[in-house]
Design a protein with these regions (language model features):
Chain A
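Terminal transmembrane helical anchor/hairpin motif
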Residues: 2, 39-67, 185, 193-272
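Transmembrane helix-loop junction
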Residues: 15, 94, 107, 138, ...
């Protein structure tokens, strides 16, 4: 079982990192990283201006560091979404659309092993992509603020890793429902960038309530550990300090719930999948 | 001894009944050709045997193991090539074969030897290190056949294996099937549209139409006593050893009377001044097929 899983993982990982999607994401992350490096040096002295309450004020180096990391993490938390869309959205639908299911379903291996191997391969390539951005971020940080990275940075990276597992599982779930890759791509984008945003606006505007249960809100913990400011115009509970321990735990729990529920449902669907 | 039991298998797609109460038992090595028109249910049957589809009713046992309930164990004995094969495009042919070999429990060194051997048999040696995304339709078909033979499975399921191949490729594919049947003693199930292909390769033929098995018999029982002779004839109307003689242009079709042999008929014809260009034995398969399939 373990051996078959590692074989499956290895081959799927190879198929992922040689794909056009991987090179497209690599290009995207290099462009974004380059842009962030430029912006970091260009607007270093204007960092406080990003937060309305701090505009024009002198701030401590510590807060400046936190703001710097907040802005990098803000962009970072969106990278896994794009990577997961590229790698996860077609994960199962492509087996049907590209007819590779006819090759893998007759193999003497559990479908759950196949799915989990592919899922971890997808998570791995997403981790590789985000790792490139993080390396550039760390180098830039060390140049700008010589010294050690704060502990909060490592917390943020840990939360990002959980988010990568979570968003990848979510895209696998969506992919398991469709037989066409395009439908899976569009659905993930629609849910994450339109439906979740619409729900955020409705809850925050009408009910002044933070819909913590939405995955994009939970993911924002990656940057909110530095400065607890939401970019939503209607956001409630903003604070210059980092997110509280309870906020971190709630976000973590939400991401884990998305992960577990999505994977379990995707497994059930994949296990019973038929290809006409 | 390997065995395949198809027990009361039906398959519904919504209101359409694609297969109706299919029963088949195969417990000796042989090649079974599944013939039938498009949409008859041939591929559906093969897909259920290989766990790509689940039966609506009934079950399939491979060496007594239910494919639907314990697919991992049941499929250990099966090699399959279903529909036109597609592979992960960024893996090479060698990696694709290694992936399957390793999943089938072969060691790294054992799988390397197996890959070389099967690539040589199927004629893909020169393409092994190319990504499968660059393969032509015919090369994918050959790779699919090589993949289906990995681990020397006891039962090989092939869905129109010669589809997309050039005439030489088709001949090579048929030769491989004959070798598998005669030397390796495997159970081979393969669907085809070509009666001539089934005749050449198979020991048994199943004719499927509208989701039902309409005919199931050994090829040897279908050998007829009809002949088709091409040559130049001089108004020949009667041959003592033959009946139902019909002449059409430079072609005669006849049925041998009981006790007559092909040689005796040909001798009679030559004694009557006929110059023979070619002789073709005719069996009942085509007749049976056309009478059953509407």
């Amino acid at each position: 079982m373990t051996n078959r899983f590692s074989i499956t993982y290895g081959y799927y990982f190879r198929n992922y990192y040689r794909s056009r999607s991987f090179y497209l994401m690599l290009l995207l992350v290099l462009l974004v990283s380059g842009l962030m490096v430029y912006l970091s040096f260009r607007y270093l002295n204007k960092l406080p201006d990003f937060i309305p309450e701090l505009k024009g004020k002198a701030i401590s180096t510590g807060l400046k560091e936190e703001l710097f990391l907040y802005i990098w993490a803000f962009v970072l938390s969106d990278l896994p979404v794009f990577a997961a869309v590229f790698f996860g959205s077609p994960a199962i639908s492509s087996e049907i659309e590209n007819r590779t299911a006819f090759q893998i379903f007759p193999l003497p291996i559990g479908r759950s092993v196949l799915l989990m191997g592919k899922y971890l391969a997808s998570v791995s390539v997403t981790l590789v992509i985000t790792a490139i951005y993080i390396i550039v971020e760390v180098i830039t940080y060390i140049i700008v603020f010589p010294g050690q990275l704060p502990v909060t940075f490592f917390k943020s990276i840990g939360l990002l890793a959980v988010f990568i597992f979570s968003i990848s599982a979510f895209t696998f779930l969506v992919s398991s429902i469709f037989k066409k890759n395009l439908y899976a791509y569009i659905t993930v984008f629609l849910i994450y960038f339109i439906i979740f945003s619409a729900m955020n606006i409705v809850f925050e505007l009408i009910y002044s309530y933070n819909p913590f249960f939405l995955l994009d809100n939970a993911a924002s913990i990656v940057e909110r550990v530095f400065v607890n400011v939401s970019t939503s115009t209607f956001a409630v509970n903003n604070s210059i300090a980092g997110a509280s321990f309870s906020s971190i735990m709630v976000a973590l729990l939400v991401m884990i719930l998305y992960l577990v529920v999505s994977i379990v449902i995707a497994l059930l669907i994949f296990e019973n999948k038929e290809v006409k | 001894m390997p065995g395949l039991d198809i027990m009361g298998v039906s398959k519904n797609f919504g209101s359409l009944q694609a297969l109706k109460d299919i029963n088949l038992n195969v417990d000796t090595p042989q090649c079974i050709g599944i013939l039938g028109p498009n949409g008859a249910g041939k591929t559906t049957l093969l897909k259920i045997i290989t766990n790509i589809l689940k039966p609506s009713e009934g079950k399939i046992l491979v060496n007594g193991v239910n494919v639907n309930q314990n697919p991992t164990k049941a499929l250990e004995k099966i090699g399959a090539l279903v529909e036109q094969p597609e592979f992960y495009p960024y893996l090479t042919g060698r990696e694709t074969m290694k992936f399957v070999a390793r999943i089938k429990g072969m060691s790294v060194s054992g799988s390397s030897e197996e890959i070389e051997k099967l690539a040589s048999i199927t004629g893909i040696t020169g393409y092994l290190d190319r990504k499968t995304g660059e393969y032509s339709r015919g090369m994918k078909q050959r790779l699919g056949l090589a993949v289906s033979m990995i681990g020397d499975p006891e039962i090989i399921v092939l869905d129109e294996p010669t589809f997309g191949l050039d005439p030489r490729g088709m001949k090579e594919m048929r030769d491989i099937l004959i070798t598998l049947k005669e030397e390796k003693k495997r159970i081979i199930l393969f669907s085809t549209h070509l009666i001539s292909e089934a005749r050449e390769v198979c020991d048994r033929v199943i004719i499927v139409d509208k989701g039902e098995i309409k005919f199931n018999d050994e090829i040897s029982d279908m050998r007829g006593n009809k002949m088709r002779i091409r040559g130049s004839f001089n108004n020949i109307k009667n041959i003592p050893g033959a009946k139902d003689l019909t002449t059409k242009g430079n072609e005669i079709t006849l049925e041998m009377k009981p006790g007559e042999t092909r040689n005796s008929i040909l001798r009679e014809l030559m004694e009557n001044g006929v110059e023979i260009d070619s002789v073709e034995g005719m069996d009942r398969m085509e007749e049976v097929y056309l009478s059953l399939v509407q």
